[in-house]
């Protein structure tokens, strides 16, 4: 009886040790699994935080990009506004510079103009007086006055020639206008007052000479 009990105890002890080893192994495996789970949880949490941070950074980057784009657009708009402003300023400056030289020739041309106009009416008045006197007086007196009228014509032309020579080339047309009244005076006086052919030819010959002298003075 005693031997059986001892065997049983020994066997029980052996079984107990095996069971304990199994329990320890099971507990170790359980602890390892728990450890892995615990480790994976922080990793998952870290991944979640990283995803959140990246998601937050993306809107920030997008906002920064939009702000930069708006700034670029504003700079472009400002540059476009400044460019048209600079162009009108340039055009205004050019317009101010261009009219400045223009008034000088205009004034110079206006100065000889009235002088020529003033001299031409005087010559016309002299011719009118000479023709009126020639109509009322005898033929002999008309011939004498005709000779005086052409003499006065060259004098007026000679007076006008220096003035034309002093002026610039832009005022050269003025002498031509002065020459026409003087040239018309001689034929008109010759046609109105009946006179011999010889005295009438002499004034006409004098008129071309005076015109040639005037042209020479203008060229000088």
UniProtKB/Swiss-Prot annotation:
Domain of life: Eukaryota
Alphabetical list of InterPro entries matching this protein: BASP1 (IPR008408)
Alphabetical GO biological process terms: negative regulation of DNA-templated transcription; podocyte differentiation; protein homooligomerization; supramolecular fiber organization
Residue(s) of cross-link: Glycyl lysine isopeptide (Lys-Gly) (interchain with G-Cter in SUMO2): 25, 85, 157
Compartments where found: Cell membrane; Cell projection, Growth cone
UniProt biased composition (Low complexity): 105-137, 149-213
Compositional bias per record (Basic and acidic residues), positions renumbered to this chain: 15-27, 49-93
Listed GO CC annotations: chromatin; COP9 signalosome; cytoplasm; growth cone; nuclear matrix; nuclear speck; nucleus; plasma membrane
Membrane topology term: Lipid-anchor
Phosphothreonine modifications at: 31, 36
Keyword set, alphabetical order: Calmodulin-binding, Cell membrane, Cell projection, Isopeptide bond, Lipoprotein, Membrane, Myristate, Phosphoprotein, Ubl conjugation
Lipidation (N-myristoyl glycine): 2
Region (Disordered): 1-220
Positions carrying Phosphoserine: 40, 91, 127, 130, 158, 165, 167, 170, 189, 212
GO molecular function: calmodulin binding; protein domain specific binding; transcription cis-regulatory region binding; transcription corepressor activity
Pfam families linked to this entry: BASP1 (PF05466)
Composition bias type Basic residues, residue spans: 1-11
Tissues where the protein occurs: Brain.
Record family assignment: Belongs to the BASP1 family.
Protein name per its UniProtKB record: Brain acid soluble protein 1
């Amino acid at each position: 009886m005693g031997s059986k009990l001892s065997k049983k105890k020994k066997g029980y002890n052996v079984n107990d040790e095996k069971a304990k080893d199994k329990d320890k192994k099971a507990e170790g495996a359980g602890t390892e699994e728990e450890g892995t789970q615990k480790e994976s949880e922080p990793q998952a949490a870290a991944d979640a935080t990283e995803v959140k941070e990246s998601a937050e950074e993306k809107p920030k980057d997008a906002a920064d990009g939009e702000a930069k784009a708006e700034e670029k657009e504003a700079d472009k708009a400002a540059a476009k506004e400044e460019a048209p402003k600079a162009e009108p300023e340039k055009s205004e400056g050019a317009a101010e510079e261009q009219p400045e030289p223009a008034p000088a020739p205009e004034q110079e041309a206006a100065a000889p103009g009235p002088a020529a106009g003033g001299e031409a009416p005087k010559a016309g008045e002299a011719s009118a007086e000479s023709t009126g006197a020639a109509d009322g007086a005898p033929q002999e007196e008309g011939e004498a006055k005709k000779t005086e009228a052409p003499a006065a014509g060259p004098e007026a032309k000679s007076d006008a020639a220096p003035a034309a020579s002093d002026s610039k080339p832009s005022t050269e047309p003025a002498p031509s206008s002065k020459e026409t009244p003087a040239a018309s005076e001689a034929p008109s006086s010759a046609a109105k007052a009946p006179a011999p052919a010889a005295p009438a030819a002499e004034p006409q010959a004098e008129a071309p000479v005076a015109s040639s002298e005037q042209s020479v003075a203008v060229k000088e």
